[in-house]
Swiss-Prot record:
Main enzyme class: transferase
EC number(s) given by UniProt: 2.3.2.6
Physiological role: Functions in the N-end rule pathway of protein degradation where it conjugates Leu, Phe and, less efficiently, Met from aminoacyl-tRNAs to the N-termini of proteins containing an N-terminal arginine or lysine.
HAMAP family, alphabetized: Leu_Phe_trans
Gene3D superfamilies xrefs: Leucyl/phenylalanyl-tRNA-protein transferase, C-terminal domain, Leucyl/phenylalanyl-tRNA-protein transferase, N-terminal domain
Family: Belongs to the L/F-transferase family.
Name the record gives this protein: Leucyl/phenylalanyl-tRNA--protein transferase
Residues annotated as transmembrane: none
Compartments where located: Cytoplasm
Main location: cytoplasm
Signal sequence range: none
Organism: Maridesulfovibrio salexigens (strain ATCC 14822 / DSM 2638 / NCIMB 8403 / VKM B-1763) (Desulfovibrio salexigens)
A single cellular component GO annotation: cytoplasm
Length: 240
């Protein structure tokens, strides 16, 4: 197969044209238009400072169906004891900066480069990218994650923790919040043992794209996300 070089227009080849490792295209930019076109097509950018922009569509793809969420006893205990408080869209730039600093075994640096941060901050301001913040009892950021929301699908980009299980607590609250709004699934993109431990499963690219098309039949939930009155306590009870 051929790896496509992108032109100025924010269009992509079909994901089925990707290489066996998932690499589909190279080049282009990180404009809001191109990024939204990518996510709507089941494609995401992932590269480092030594390479041009690379665009991927993996087969298989990792997703989380909400009824498969696994919450460990330890996380349940921390939720029950109110060790953390979870918010949305309160500190996006702090969350993505912490994700960029996160050490990842086997990687020499980070793929969340300055231009990547700038691009996702723009999408956050447009209401398409959202952050989850996890605060400890002292009011300090203990963990979090961020991702892209289109239609009824949330594509998780990265998560971090500064205290044990903080990101798992945030992810668990997010999943319940999305479920309450009839989202269809979370796109976890790349298979990792960590995400699989939370209940994520691999599906074929073909099935993923069918699920994505169905989820995109609904309008995006743009703007600042927040819990409805009484919802936070309800989710806390569910997760406990």
């Amino acid at each position: 197969m051929v790896v496509y070089r992108l032109i100025e227009d924010p269009i992509f080849p079909h994901p089925d044209e990707a290489e066996p490792d998932g690499l589909l295209a190279v080049g282009g930019d990180l404009s809001p238009e191109r990024l939204l076109s990518a996510y709507a097509s089941g494609i995401f950018p992932w590269y480092d400072e030594r390479s041009p922009i690379l665009w991927w569509s993996l087969d298989p793809r990792l997703i989380l169906n909400f009824d498969k969420l696994h919450v460990s006893r330890r996380v349940k205990r921390k939720v029950r004891k109110r060790e953390y408080t979870v918010t949305f869209d309160r500190a996006f730039e702090s969350v993505i900066a912490n994700c960029a600093r996160k050490f990842r075994p086997g990687q020499a640096g980070t793929w969340i480069l300055p231009e990547m941060i700038e691009a996702y901050v723009k999408l956050h301001k447009l209401g398409f990218v959202h952050s989850v913040e996890v605060w400890n009892r002292e009011g300090n950021l203990a963990g979090g994650l961020y991702g892209v929301s289109l239609g009824k699908v949330f594509s998780g980009e990265s998560m971090f923790f500064l205290e044990p299980d903080a990101s798992k607590v945030g992810f668990s609250y997010l999943v319940q919040w999305l479920k309450n709004r009839e989202f269809h699934f979370v796109d976890c993109q790349q298979p990792t043992d960590h995400l699989k431990s939370l209940g994520a499963e691999e599906v074929s690219r073909e099935l993923f794209l069918d699920m994505l098309d169905e989820a995109l039949e609904h309008p995006a939930l743009r703007g600042t996300w927040e819990f409805m009155e009484g919802e936070y306590e309800m989710i806390t009870e569910v997760l406990s």
